[in-house]
UniProtKB/Swiss-Prot annotation:
GO terms for biological process: siderophore biosynthetic process; vibriobactin biosynthetic process. It comes from the Bacteria. Its EC number is 6.2.1.71. Keywords: Cell inner membrane, Cell membrane, Ligase, Membrane, Transmembrane, Transmembrane helix. Pfam families: AMP-binding (PF00501), AMP-binding_C (PF13193). Belongs to the ATP-dependent AMP-binding enzyme family. It comes from Vibrio cholerae serotype O1 (strain ATCC 39315 / El Tor Inaba N16961). The lineage of its organism: Bacteria, Pseudomonadati, Pseudomonadota, Gammaproteobacteria, Vibrionales. It is a single-pass membrane protein. GO terms for cellular component: plasma membrane. It catalyses: 2,3-dihydroxybenzoate + holo-[ACP] + ATP = 2,3-dihydroxybenzoyl-[ACP] + AMP + diphosphate. The gene is vibE. Pathway: Siderophore biosynthesis; vibriobactin biosynthesis. This is Vibriobactin-specific 2,3-dihydroxybenzoate-AMP ligase.
Length: 543
């Protein structure tokens, strides 16, 4: 029997409650507390909408009643794929209120990923944006209905263009009926998505208790309060802008979230000046772009207190440059959707902020740095990071075999990150052990792309490697061996991957053709040799 959810051991759960980490409240309870304190305070701005706390809460309750009337109930799974719009949070909280579990798909996900989420979770509904651009999600939903038998309803923000009665408009879901909240703080609240190293992203089950602790502790560390004005330019469904402290942290503190569907500095700087933004979260490529643009920008960015950078390693040189370029403090963030989050603290020295990725949220976060044999390394030595704690999951959803590889016998999560741990407990990220490309914060599993390439009739063998990129940190390069007397070009291969339903960010940035892939002494593809051959920028930086 497949395990849906791996709970924390009872002794640990009891300890976390005794310490006050787990409050046995739902995520909606924290929003309700803010609505009670400051009902008329501005909570959310975006897409020509403004929501004050009490009005937002009432709208969430109306949606919750409407979702219940659709036949969705506690324990049902729903794929939620909305961008940076107010309805993302309204739907998120409404589903949580009823114990309905949203899978937080990203706007960039396409057929291959969404089909897997629906089939693996037996999702009953798919919630999407009705706009045709930049992507037609309604057309995707029609494909899903043909291959996902549990999918009963497609809920569309905006207008439906499909006559199928399974398509309904979100606007019709608001109900004046009352319904009893049905969420359990100890059970799965929603699903985040893993970066993945073995194909399609795994589902990460987060409970109300563990996630709420992560957010509330982050609020304290980052000193969010009712005066916080947070600009969300990264995809709202990402763990980083959702909970570190992210939008949820702003709601908990009684501040205001300003949404932007455009992350460009030209647009974002205008919003910073207009709304007196105090904090935002960026991935390294975006931070570099903003820094470059700030040098010639005339917008007033003086309201910024600090900018968070995470999702991928931020170079020391860039970290030292940011405070002067943007006129505010840098906070480095190193975290994962599976749990563990590290922050540099706001009162840390400039040297610590520039040279480390922070230290953990909790005194009860356990970090182990081990060698290839699983033995602890000396302080300051490089090794592989393992972790467990009050907000780090104990297993992926319905993934027993993968869990045996991803967690050790003591329940520690094997992160796949190579790090050093300082004597003060600060983490310095040095690399990755997993076969994964971190493209500007978007994680790409090499195996997933390789498997799709191998389905092409002209491809004999394929390897996907990471190569250095000045802005993205890493980009992807597919190295292809063709079958005898077969031919295919780069454009045709990329089109093939698009047609297979891969997300755009997974399409290789570069494709190289060679006669034979190099092998190690045990017959595995030697990706280090491929990187040495094709990563010209990385070699230049090392020389």
């Amino acid at each position: 029997m497949t395990t849906d959810f791996t709970p924390w051991p009872e002794a640990l759960a009891a300890q976390y409650r005794q310490l006050g980490y787990w409050q046995d409240k739902t995520l909606l309870d924290y929003l309700q507390q803010s609505a009670e304190r400051t009902p008329n305070a501005l909570a959310l701005v975006g897409d020509n909408q403004q929501w004050r706390y009490q009005a937002m809460l009432e709208r969430i309750e109306q949606l919750a009643a409407g979702f219940t009337e659709l036949g969705l109930g506690c324990g049902d799974n729903v794929v939620l794929q909305l961008g940076n719009v107010a309805e993302f949070y309204l739907c998120f909280f409404a589903l949580l209120r009823q114990g309905i579990r949203p899978i937080l798909a990203l706007p960039a996900h396409r057929l291959a990923e969404i089909r897997y989420f629906c089939q693996h979770s037996q999702a009953k509904a798919y919630l999407i944006d009705g706009a045709q651009r930049p992507f037609d999600y309604q057309a995707l939903a029609q494909e899903l209905l043909a291959c996902c038998p549990t999918l009963q309803t497609v809920i569309v923000r905006g207008q439906t263009r499909v006559t199928d009665p399974k398509f309904i408009e979100l606007a019709s879901c608001y109900s004046a009926s009352s319904c009893q909240a049905n969420a359990d703080p100890n059970q799965i609240a929603f699903f985040q998505l893993s970066g993945g190293t073995t194909g399609t992203p795994k589902l990460i089950p987060r409970t109300h208790n563990d996630y709420a602790y992560s957010v509330t502790a982050s609020v304290e560390i980052c000193r969010f309060d009712q005066h916080t004005r947070y600009l969300c330019v990264l995809p709202a469904a990402h763990n980083f802008p959702l909970s570190s402290p992210g939008a949820l942290g702003v709601f908990w503190a009684g501040g205001c979230v300003v949404l932007s569907q455009d992350a460009s500095p030209q647009h974002a700087f205008k919003l910073i000046e207009q709304h007196k933004i105090t904090v935002t979260a960026l991935v390294p490529p975006l931070a570099l772009l903003w820094m470059d643009h700030a040098e010639k920008s005339t917008y007033d960015l003086s309201s910024l207190h600090f900018v968070q950078v995470g999702g991928a390693k931020f170079s020391e040189a860039a970290a030292r440059r940011l405070p002067k370029a943007l006129g505010c403090q840098l906070q480095q963030v190193f975290g994962m959707a599976e749990g563990l989050v590290n922050y540099t603290r706001l009162d840390d020295s400039a040297e610590l902020i520039a040279t480390t990725q922070g230290r953990p949220i909790s005194a009860h976060d356990q970090l182990l740095v081990v060698d290839e044999q699983g033995q602890p390394v000396a302080s300051g030595e490089e090794g592989y990071l393992l972790t467990q704690g009050p907000y780090t999951i104990r297993g992926y959803y319905r993934a027993d075999q993968h869990n045996q590889r991803a967690f050790n016998a003591q329940g520690f999560y094997i992160t796949g990150d190579k790090v050093k741990l300082s004597s003060e407990g600060y983490v310095i990220v040095t690399g990755r052990a997993k076969d994964q490309i971190n493209r500007g914060g978007e994680k790409i599993a090499a195996e997933e792309v390789e498997n799709q390439l191998l389905h092409h009739p002209a491809v004999h063998d394929a390897a996907l490697i990471a190569i250095s990129d000045e802005y993205l940190g890493e980009r992807s390069c597919a190295v292809i061996v063709l079958k005898p007397e077969q031919s295919v070009n780069t454009i045709q291969l990329k089109r093939f991957l698009h047609q297979a339903g891969l997300a755009d960010y997974k399409i290789p940035d570069q494709i190289q053709f060679i006669d034979q892939l190099p092998k190690t002494s045990v017959g595995k593809i030697d990706k280090n040799a491929l990187r040495r051959r094709f990563d010209t920028l990385g070699l230049a930086l090392m020389s």
